Amino acid sequence: MKSSVCIELVFTEYPFLERIERAAEAGFDAIEFWNWDNKDLPAIKAAVDKAGLGIAAFQANLGGTLVHPDHQDSFVASIQKSLDKAQELGAPSMFLLTDELGDDRSVRFQFPELGEEKKYQSVLGGLTALAPLAEEAGVTLVLEPLNTRADHPGYFLNRSHIGFELVRAVDSPHIKVLYDIYHMQVMEGNVIETLTGNLDVIQHVHVADVPGRHEPGTGELNYANILKALR
């Protein structure tokens, strides 16, 4: 099991590129970040190479949504651009969201007229279309459930079991789930049993404590037992 750190959220007292050096000093194997289209990717690549780190993942979404069938073609085309960047950077994974988030991380367009079943089928169709593209690129798209109670009201994929179900239906080694312990503790709890029962479809795990999304050990979660179960 390798460790990576999201430098959007950690070491924020330093300039962005300097956070890579701080991550190496802290003993991480790799870094993560969110959007790629507003960053100097060659500079990031040079900095991680110099620090001896990898890029574990970054966000695939460039806008658009998986939940509306009329947006599927443009969404898939945008993800192809991200897959190309992942290949250039040597990143094995990219985070994939079902909805478009604004700068404040809220869902921009919720499409309540569609209903949950139509959204589900649209997401399934989009993932099915993305699977061969991800396979060809050698990159894994990790679908991320988020909480709708504290952070992202209106987000479609707010339960882990729906993500597991979708990924199993697509049945591709390059479409997996990102299980974020913070988000799913807020929504459903039962972290250890959920993790250990679905490791076949989980590619990536994010850690933070509840409440507040702070460092492990600052809240209600028993991270010693969670990490023991993962190992």
Specify the residue positions occupied by each region the protein language model found.
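N-terminal pre-domain/capping segments
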Residues: 1-92, 117-118, 124, 168, ...
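Active-site-proximal loop/turn and secondary-structure-junction residues that shape catalytic pockets
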Residues: 9-11, 35-37, 61-64, 100-102, ...
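Acidic/histidine-rich catalytic cores of soluble enzymes
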Residues: 17, 21-25, 45, 50, ...
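Short beta-strand segments at enzyme active-site cores
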Residues: 33, 57-58, 92-99, 137-145
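Short, basic/glycine-rich phosphate-binding loops at helix/coil junctions
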Residues: 55, 59, 104-106, 143-145, ...
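Charge-dense, low-complexity intrinsically disordered segments
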Residues: 69, 73, 113-117, 157, ...
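Short alpha-helical linear motifs
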Residues: 101-104, 220
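Surface-exposed cleft-lining segments at the edges of enzyme active sites
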Residues: 105-121, 148-155
